[in-house]
Amino acid sequence: MKYSHMDNDCVVFENLKSRGATLTKRDGSRKIHVAFDDFKYFVLWTKKCAPYLCLEPWNGIPDRVDADGILVNKEGILALEPGGTQIFTHHISILA
């Protein structure tokens, strides 16, 4: 990844066949795996020149440039009935 990939805020993946992602340090000395069965989107983001990369499963995404700003029209919104609940689970494994 390059910082320039984050120029528009983040990188959003959807409709992935894989339900997990592994980040490996260039020298192979460290690895982290994120499993995200219950999520529609997988997002990578960082701050410019920060020493980290965030790997996050999401069920909603930031507005696109052409969004109308109306919540019910927002892509990725999950609506529950009053009093309704939903559980989402993801797992993070430190592999090395």
Describe every region a protein language model picked out.
Residues C10, G20, V43, C49-Y52, ...:
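Residue-level detector of solvent-exposed, low-hydrophobicity positions
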Residues M1-D37:
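Active-site/ligand-binding surface loops and adjacent short beta/alpha elements
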Residues M1, N8, C54, H91-L95:
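Short, Lys/Arg-enriched charge-dense amphipathic segments
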Residues L78-L95:
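Short Pro-Gly-centered flexible turn/kink motifs
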Residues F13, L23-T24, L44-T46, P82:
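A general structural signal for short secondary-structure junctions and capping/turn motifs
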Residues D7, K17, D38, T46-K48, ...:
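Solvent-exposed, flexible loop/coil residues
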Residues R64-K74:
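Short beta-strand and strand-turn-strand segments in soluble, beta-rich domains
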Residues K25-D66:
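Glycine-rich active-site loops that engage anionic ligands at enzyme catalytic sites
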